[in-house]
């Protein structure tokens, strides 16, 4: 078994090459084509990949020295438009439940350096089977892939599901205007689409501008980051006849952990554990908490990853035999999981825990605020809570006054900064590091600023 890198935009050529790597008994190191090529080179070297299949158009743009230790092989994307997966792709796909390495997926790096996550064929195939169990696709269904295939949720929850069930699949480029996606959903009679909250918000906004006819669309699945109540409510109002289900997971566990289903989970939870997965919530001492109490989410599954290329899990398990997800959450009285924040994002102010997502939820109740992100930032030796928000107007004082009636004093951000757009990672997640950098820069440029309130 060798590790073989693969770099390319979504295309039939990409999928065909991926299956060829697997059929040759090798492990595919999936690298996002949008990251700098120098970073991809570092990842290849880290993963000991000696061969790299790369889309010809991307290879033509390489402007750094290429090491002799890696053999680059180009392939043609062939088509820049969305297209249906042809029969020969389904025919050459072979189900594989061995424990040999299947893929190396690099984490999104929302809080730091990306880590190479090793997943076996057994892990991704058993997880895909569990997804099929709740998704229940039929021969009449058609799934639309709008996110990059180098991410575990797209690879396992969309591509593998389609290949295993022979469901029709439309593969589309990733960086396109929302009207392109909506037009293709109509053109190809798409029934299932999987989005992240950012894409869902973009499609909702575009749909409001022009009333598209989407009679075939029967299900929208949302994953990738916490779905705010504001986006959730707007999407349900925009697509009243299309069920919208939250799903949750992380690459280290296959990736899917929980999912909403038609027979349950009506609110903005992330659903219940899927087949073969167990979830428990524990406190910092490793003791299980009661329903409704916040704790650290731990998962037990047969789809567990094989480890990292370099390093160890950042969050040590607090419950023997379970994987620490690094997420704070709780289970409600209906047995549904709710994700609150990453453990790393929780802010400690005067021994009090502040959950950014809860502060953000209150800020987003202000209609003129389109998006916001709350994070901890250091200034003159002190730790403060700061907020970046997107709005047409400067609403600093308005937001602050509104929060006084809804939050405790120490939960209210000390500094508010209006911006045109929130900083995001390559896959659309809000970058905590980017938010902190923007806030820190603002404070440095306004060193004598009077920061109102006390936290």
Give the location of each predicted region.
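Conserved AMP-binding/adenylate-forming
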Residues: 1-35, 148, 353
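Conserved pre-ATP/AMP-binding loop-to-beta segment of ANL
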Residues: 83-106, 113, 136-142
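Conserved AMP-binding A3 loop
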Residues: 102-129
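Conserved AMP-binding/adenylation subdomain of ANL enzymes
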Residues: 125-142, 152-191
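Gly/Ser/Thr-rich phosphate-binding loop
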Residues: 191-195, 206-266
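AMP-binding/adenylate-forming catalytic core of the ANL superfamily
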Residues: 193, 301, 328-411, 437
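Conserved ATP/PPi-binding loop(s) of AMP-dependent carboxylate-activating enzymes
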Residues: 272-276, 287-317, 352-354
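AMP-binding/adenylate-forming catalytic domain of the ANL superfamily
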Residues: 407-430, 452-454
């Amino acid at each position: 078994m060798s590790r073989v890198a693969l770099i390319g935009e979504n295309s039939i050529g990409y999928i065909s090459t991926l299956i060829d790597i697997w059929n040759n008994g090798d492990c595919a190191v999936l690298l996002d084509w949008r990251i700098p090529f120098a970073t991809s080179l570092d990842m290849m070297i880290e993963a000991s990949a000696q061969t790299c299949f790369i889309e010809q158009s991307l290879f033509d743009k390489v402007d750094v020295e290429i090491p002799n230790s890696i053999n680059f092989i180009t392939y043609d994307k062939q088509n820049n438009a969305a297209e249906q997966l042809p029969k020969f792709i389904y025919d050459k796909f072979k189900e594989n439940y061995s424990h040999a390495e299947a893929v190396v997926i690099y984490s999104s790096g929302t809080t730091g350096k990306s880590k190479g996550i090793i997943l076996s064929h057994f892990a991704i195939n058993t997880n895909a089977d569990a997804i099929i169990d709740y998704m229940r696709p039929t021969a009449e269904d058609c799934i639309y892939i709008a996110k990059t295939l180098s991410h575990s949720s797209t690879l396992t929850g969309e591509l593998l599901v389609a290949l295993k069930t022979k469901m029709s699949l439309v593969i589309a480029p990733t960086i396109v205007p929302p009207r392109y996606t909506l037009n293709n959903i109509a053109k190809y009679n798409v029934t299932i689409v999987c989005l992240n909250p950012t894409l869902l918000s973009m499609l909702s906004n575009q749909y409001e501008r022009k009333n598209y006819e989407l009679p075939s669309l029967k299900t929208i699945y949302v994953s990738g980051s916490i779905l705010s109540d504001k986006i959730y409510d707007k999407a349900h109002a925009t697509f009243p006849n299309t069920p919208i289900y939250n799903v949750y997971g992380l690459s280290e566990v296959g990736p899917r952990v929980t999912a909403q289903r038609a027979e349950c989970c009506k609110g903005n939870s992330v659903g219940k554990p899927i087949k073969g997965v167990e979830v428990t919530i524990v406190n910092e001492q490793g003791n299980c908490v009661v329903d409704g109490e916040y704790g650290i989410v731990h998962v037990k599954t047969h789809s567990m990853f094989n480890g990292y290329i370099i390093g160890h899990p950042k969050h040590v398990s607090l419950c023997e035999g379970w994987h620490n997800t690094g997420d704070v959450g709780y289970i409600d009285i209906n047995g549904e999981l709710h994700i609150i924040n990453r453990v790393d994002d929780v802010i400690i102010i005067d021994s009090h825990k502040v959950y950014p997502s809860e502060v953000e939820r209150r800020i987003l109740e202000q209609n003129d605020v389109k998006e916001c992100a709350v994070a901890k930032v250091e200034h003159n030796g002190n730790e403060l809570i700061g907020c970046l928000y997107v709005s047409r107007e400067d609403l600093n004082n308005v937001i602050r006054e509104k929060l006084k009636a809804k939050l405790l004093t120490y939960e209210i951000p000390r500094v508010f900064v209006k911006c045109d757009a929130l900083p995001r990672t390559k896959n659309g997640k809000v970058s905590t590091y980017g938010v902190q950098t923007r806030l820190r820069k603002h404070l440095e440029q306004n060193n004598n600023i009077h920061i109102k309130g006390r936290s």
